[in-house]
Swiss-Prot record:
Primary location group: membrane
Quaternary organization: Interacts with PTPRG.
Domain spans labelled Fibronectin type-III: 600-698, 703-800, 805-901, 902-996
Gene3D superfamilies tied to this protein: Immunoglobulins
Record function comment: Contactins mediate cell surface interactions during nervous system development. Participates in oligodendrocytes generation by acting as a ligand of NOTCH1. Its association with NOTCH1 promotes NOTCH1 activation through the released notch intracellular domain (NICD) and subsequent translocation to the nucleus. Involved in motor coordination.
Gene name linked to the record: CNTN6
Lipid-attached positions, GPI-anchor amidated serine: 999
Protein family per UniProt: Belongs to the immunoglobulin superfamily. Contactin family.
Name assigned to this protein: Contactin-6
Domain Ig-like C2-type intervals: 26-117, 122-208, 227-308, 318-402, 408-495, 499-587
Residue span of region Disordered: 887-908
Keyword Disulfide bond appears in the UniProt entry: yes
Length: 1028
């Protein structure tokens, strides 16, 4: 009997465990929703969706109004997967509440309930409607009277034969609750036939009623009267959470009433409310608890007002706050599940197991959302649902309860085969077999049963913990697990290793930026254990691959030293060497302090600024681990090249000084300031520049220099100077003061020049005698006052142009392109005008005025060569004197004809003979053209190949003899000499040095690109030597 009881308990467990990794309860992925189906489409099919996941795959059932649907009895229903398909649905048979059930081996779950309804609208009755008679100014209601229907309707009205709907405004309103047309005040244009038009979107159908005639009575006009509210919203409206609530209110009256809204509790209407149709409709979207309360509509005109009010009551379907979760428990354990939902009104709870209602009994306690099952057995396994329900909706939370019963089993969680530990360490050997109910645990070392002692503890979860390990603790350890269904054993080995010790830890270091250091980290360890070194900097692992520019691990198997190259300020901090083995992790830490030049000072402020000084303050930046010893202030202006150090008070700014006065500034100049700090390591980066500020204006102190002048016209005194640069003008309104007086006079004349860029002043007075000496000084001024004056300089007044023309002018032609002009010097005095030099003018018969040549010579020069002339051309020339005032009268013109052009043909058929150091040359006589000058002789030009100096030999013959030392090659050319100048040269002839000369006969050169035929013949004794 006991064996049979065990089998009953174990059989479900075996089946469940066989696929424990795969089995899963049904979980809905699709649930049915309410459907309103068009009645006119009854010959088609309606689908109620349902789908669920689970393993094995769930199968499905459906309930209609709580009764199972029999799919085998009728073609009317069929399953499409888990969804219910109803063929040709019928309003009498199929209307109602539907629910889907999904089932597999683990249990059954119920879906939400879905309502199936049928939308329709019948036709209006065809009988004629009665005529409605009203006076002008009276209000009227035209009834729509919708036919039988189901589903939401929308209403509109047409007028006479107009296809467009009646437009609604503050005088006309169509209620979407009743369908009636309300006209607040009838006008003559309202007379006609009105037709109600109804659309049922869910039924996909529209119907049109019979026309209602509206006529105007002839017994007078309706007088004014107070509003009469015809469209009212209900006194109580149930409004769902998150829904959109619409309240209608419309009144008849003369004049046409205005509509307004308010809350009776005095609170303002929510900002989200929307008004439409001249405020006849108030819409509250996304309705919430705070929106409920009493609302009032006020219709008013000049004759009075009327009110309509109603209460909006908030309700909310249930929503889960706490759901139940899948739970696996051992046999005989207790289950406690709690679910909780919100809603208004508060929901009540029911519990289901595998789709059936669960009722309280001896082991089962149900109280609101709490389910307690004591002393679980395998039959309690299944899928449970907590249902939360109020009068508006029911919702379900699903979970699986799996009750397990089995003997101890180590197959999924065996004792670790090998456990390693170091001498002196602690170890926990786990023992966690699968056993339901939980197994009792005991341990053996070898064959010895272990009992708890000072070093050996049996933990609550069955694990074995041993403290302060010694070598003798090594061996095999067996865990024995027992419950009422059986016993199981599992064994593992404990291996004891020597401890790892850091023998050389890193130590604190103090270094300077740019140095390289080594942080030691060396260990002793069990030879069989692999050691891994990991370095941390300020808590972060140092990536030695990415940090290759600075960090490098050096050393062997037991050495993990860290080298830091070119150390920087940001390398200051804590360095942690971690030694990791499979058994333990050791670490040692050291602080590295990196010292460097200070960081940039901060918050540089200009406290005050005058014309030449500025008060500065600043805060010290980081000292980078070395105290700041000195500060330096630098300035920059638009006129300076970069930043310049400036003088300060105090003169030396030590590391504790944070304000100073900058002196020696220029007035009215824009300055930027910055501060630089220094310490024993070096000078740091400068601070950010201060704001750009201008010093105050001041009287200028720098006087102009390089005072000169003179020249100009008669009766003028011209004074020049070097202008003062902007940075020395010291303020706005800058200009120059010009002071002058004749030499010997005691009275100064004073003039002002307001242009800051001026460097010249001309004073004109007819009484000024030419070339009179004046004492001159130039000063400066600005809006602040007059500044310094220069030293006195003598400047002469302007002079007259020369009054006399040169005499004895003559012309002589030297060549085809050159002539010489000569004249007699003028003896001048103050009355005839000073002569500084002479100007030669020359031209041809056909020269235009713009083509007249001009050449000046200074001093007492009385001849001038003019070159670049045309050959065989008549040239005219005249000469005139000049001075600073201008030029005087010209001499009478003279003329001369330039020589004919020199010969254009170069000497030809040049032959040469070299004997020792004597070179004999001969050539043909050059015949000239008719327009060329006759040949008067020849020039031989010769030079050594590697020298630039050329020697010239002139001859009247067509041959020449040269005595030259031929230690180098010589280059020779020959040209004609004539009255017109030198003619064209022959091509260069290369005469080799004696040591390289050999007899080679005669060589003829091809004609040149200038069509010059040259034949070079080399004679040596009686043989002919060819050209090299």
């Amino acid at each position: 009997m006991r064996l049979l009881w065990k089998l009953v308990i174990l059989l479900p467990l075996i089946n469940s465990s066989a696929g424990d990794g795969l089995l899963s309860r049904p979980i809905f992925t699709q649930e049915p929703h309410d459907v309103i189906f068009p009645l006119d489409l009854s010959k088609s099919e309606v689908i109620l969706n349902c789908a669920a996941n689970g393993y094995p795959s769930p199968h499905y059932r459906w309930k209609q109004n709580g009764t199972d649907i029999d799919f085998t009895m009728s073609y009317h229903y069929r399953l499409d997967g888990g969804s219910l398909a109803i063929n040709s649905p019928h309003t009498d048979q199929d209307i109602g509440m539907y629910q889907c059930l999904a089932t597999n081996l683990l249990g059954t779950i119920l879906s939400r309930k879905a309502k199936l309804q049928f939308a329709y609208i019948e036709d209006f009755e065809t009988k004629t409607r009665s005529t409605v008679s009203v006076r002008e100014g009276q209000g009227v209601v035209l009834l729509c009277g919708p036919p039988p229907h189901f589903g939401d309707l929308s209403y509109a009205w047409t007028f006479n034969d107009n296809p467009l709907y009646v437009q609604e405004d503050n005088r006309r309103f169509v209620s979407q609750e009743t369908g009636n047309l309300y006209i607040a005040k009838v006008e003559p244009s309202d007379v006609g036939n009105y037709t109600c038009f109804i659309t049922n979107k869910e039924a996909q159908r529209s119907v049109q009623g019979p026309p209602t005639p509206l006529v105007q009575r002839t017994d007078g006009v309706m007088g004014e009267y107070e509003p009469k509210i015809e469209v009212r919203f209900p006194e109580t409206i149930q409004a769902a959470k998150d829904s959109s609530v619409k309240l209608e209110c419309f009144a008849l009256g003369n004049p046409v009433p205005d509509i307004s809204w308010r809350r009776l509790d005095g609170s303002p209407l929510p900002g989200k409310v929307k008004y439409s149709k001249s405020q006849a409709i108030l819409e509250i979207p996304n309705f919430q608890q705070e929106d409920e309360g009493f609302y009032e509509c006020i219709a008013s005109n000049l004759r009075g007002r009327n009110l309509a009010k109603g209460q909006l009551i908030f309700y909310a379907p249930p929503e889960w706050e706490q759901k139940i979760q899948n739970t696996h428990l051992s046999i005989y354990d207790n289950l406690l599940w709690e679910c909780k939902a919100s809603g208004k009104p508060n929901p009540w709870y029911t519990w289901l197991k595998n789709g059936e209602r669960l009722n309280p009994e001896e082991r089962i306690q149900i109280e609101n959302g709490t389910l307690i099952i004591t002393m679980l057995n395998v039959s309690d396994s299944g899928v449970y649902q907590c249902a939360a329900e109020n009068k508006y909706q029911i919702i379900y939370a699903n979970a699986e309860l799996r009750v397990l019963a089995s003997a101890p089993d180590f197959s999924k969680s065996p004792v670790k085969k090998k456990s390693f530990v170091q001498v002196g360490g602690d170890i926990v050997i786990g023992c966690k077999p699968n056993a339901f109910p939980r197994a009792a645990i005991s341990w053996k070392r070898g064959t010895e049963t272990l009992r708890q002692s000072k070093r050996i503890f049996l933990l609550e979860d069955g694990s074995l913990k041993i403290y302060n390990i010694t070598r003798s603790d090594a061996g095999s350890y067996t865990c024995i697990a027992t419950n009422q269904f059986g016993t199981a054993k599992n064994t593992g080995s404990l291996i004891v290793k020597e401890r790892t010790v850091i023998t050389v830890p890193p130590s604190k270091m103090d270094v300077t930026v740019g140095e390289s250091i080594v942080l030691p980290c060396q260990v002793s360890h069990d030879p069989s254990i692999e050691v891994v070194f990991v370095w941390f900097f300020n808590g972060d692992v140092i990536d030695l691959k990415k940090g290759v520019a600075h960090f490098e691990r050096i050393g062997g198997e037991s050495v993990g030293d860290l080298m830091i190259r070119n150390i920087q300020l940001h390398h200051s901090g804590k360095y942690l060497c971690t030694v990791q083995t499979t058994l333990e992790s050791l670490s040692a830490v050291a602080d590295i302090i990196v010292r460097g030049p200070p960081g940039p000072p901060e918050d540089v402020q200009v406290e005050d600024i005058s014309s030449t000084t500025s008060q500065l303050s600043w805060r010290a930046g980081p000292d980078n681990n070395s105290p700041i010893q000195i500060f330096t202030i630098q300035t920059r202006t638009p006129f300076s090249v970069g930043w310049q150090a400036v003088a300060t008070v105090p003169e030396i700014l030590n590391g504790k000084t944070y304000n100073a006065t900058v002196v020696g500034l220029s007035p009215w100049v824009e300055y930027e300031f910055r501060v630089v700090a220094g310490n024993s390591i070096g000078i740091g980066e400068p601070s950010e520049p201060s704001e750009l500020l201008r010093t105050k204006a001041s009287v200028p102190v720098v006087a102009p220099v390089n005072i000169h002048g003179g020249g100009g016209s008669r009766s003028e005194l011209v004074i020049t100077w070097e202008s003062i640069p902007e940075e020395l003008q010291n303020g706005e309104g800058f200009g120059y003061i010009i002071m002058f007086r004749p030499v010997g006079s005691t009275t100064w004349s004073k003039e002002k020049v307001s242009s800051v860029e001026s460097s010249r002043f001309v004073y004109r007075n007819e009484s000024i005698i030419p070339l009179s000496p004046f004492e001159v000084k130039v000063g400066v001024y600005n809006n602040e006052g007059e500044g310094s004056l220069s030293t006195v300089t003598i400047v002469y007044s302007g002079e007259d142009e020369p009054q006399l023309a040169p005499r004895g002018t003559s012309l002589q032609s030297f060549s085809a392109s050159e002539m010489e002009v000569s004249w007699n010097a003028i003896a001048w005095n103050r009355n005839t005008g000073r002569v500084l030099g002479y100007e030669v003018l020359y031209w041809t018969d056909d020269s235009k005025e713009s083509m007249i040549g001009k050449i000046r010579v200074s001093g007492n020069v009385t001849t001038k060569n003019i070159t670049g002339l045309k050959a065989n051309t008549i040239y005219f020339a005249s000469v005139r004197a000049y001075n600073t005032a201008g030029t005087g009268p010209s001499s009478p013109p003279v003329n001369v004809t330039t020589k004919k052009s020199p010969p254009s043909q170069p000497p030809a058929n040049i032959a040469w003979k070299l004997t020792n150091s004597k070179l004999c040359l001969n050539w043909e006589h050059v015949k000239t053209m008719e327009n060329e000058s006759e040949v008067l002789g020849y020039k031989i030009l010769y030079r050594q190949n590697r020298q630039s100096k050329t020697h010239i030999l002139e001859t009247n013959n067509t041959s020449a003899e040269l005595l030259v030392p031929f230690e180098e090659d010589y280059l020779i050319e020959i040209r004609t000499v004539s009255d017109g100048g030198d003619g064209s040269s022959s091509e260069e002839i290369r005469i080799p040095k004696m040591s390289s000369l050999s007899s080679r006969g005669i060589q003829f050169l091809e004609p040149s690109t200038h069509f010059l035929s040259i034949v070079i013949v080399i004679f040596h004794c009686f043989a002919i030597q060819p050209l090299i």
